[in-house]
């Protein structure tokens, strides 16, 4: 009985294989490290180019950056509040741009052309380590926001409006980073896998509209993550009466 011609392409689809670098006792995930810094470098280059010659009438990259600045400012002001939103704009903006560029970079850049000894390159946000790290950073940020603005009064939140809420709000502190990390990871990984499988099955036809749909959902996921991060920070600094 002969082997089906469809078996080999599916066998070549690598899921869960990683390239690791060992530096002393530290084990670094090479794929995420490389793609993250490539995309961060591209983002920094865009910012430098857009702000090199600032004009009163913005054009090109400067116009794009000013649009993003206004968008992030409105997002932070709406979710965090007028009082302290300016302090958190850089953080929310960095989260949004990094996730957005990572998601789109995974979809648009032909990473598979770069061969690795093990695994393959892809969106940093398609790796659970990246999304968990971002989610934990958000958790630390809203704890810091609450304590820095209210001091020990922040813990009144856990018994507001009634002490019965204490166990539920403690559980909520664990579910927030879990939902943030797994939502982002699951959506981006699923998008990459669907496109990869369709490329094997129906190359050059069906994957194209799916890729455009993936770009849309990738942008939405970046917006959801940044919006929830800002909302959690706003919730932490909100005064309860």
Curated annotation (Swiss-Prot):
Pfam families per record: ATP-synt_A
InterPro entries found in the cross-reference section: ATP_syn_F0_a_bact/chloroplast, ATP_synth_F0_asu, ATP_synth_F0_asu_AS, F0_ATP_A_sf
Signal sequence interval, chain numbering: none
Record's keyword terms, sorted: ATP synthesis, CF(0), Hydrogen ion transport, Ion transport, Membrane, Thylakoid, Transmembrane, Transmembrane helix, Transport
A GO MF label: proton-transporting ATP synthase activity, rotational mechanism
Keyword Nucleotide-binding recorded: no
Membrane topology: Multi-pass membrane protein
Record's keyword annotation contains Transmembrane: yes
Protein origin, superkingdom: Bacteria
Intracellular or extracellular location(s): Cellular thylakoid membrane
Annotated transmembrane regions: 30-50, 91-111, 128-148, 193-213, 214-234
GO cellular component: plasma membrane-derived thylakoid membrane; proton-transporting ATP synthase complex
Subunit organization: F-type ATPases have 2 components, CF(1) - the catalytic core - and CF(0) - the membrane proton channel. CF(1) has five subunits: alpha(3), beta(3), gamma(1), delta(1), epsilon(1). CF(0) has four main subunits: a, b, b' and c.
Protein function: Key component of the proton channel; it plays a direct role in the translocation of protons across the membrane.
Family: Belongs to the ATPase A chain family.
Protein name: ATP synthase subunit a
Organism: Prochlorococcus marinus (strain SARG / CCMP1375 / SS120)
Gene that this polypeptide is encoded by: atpB
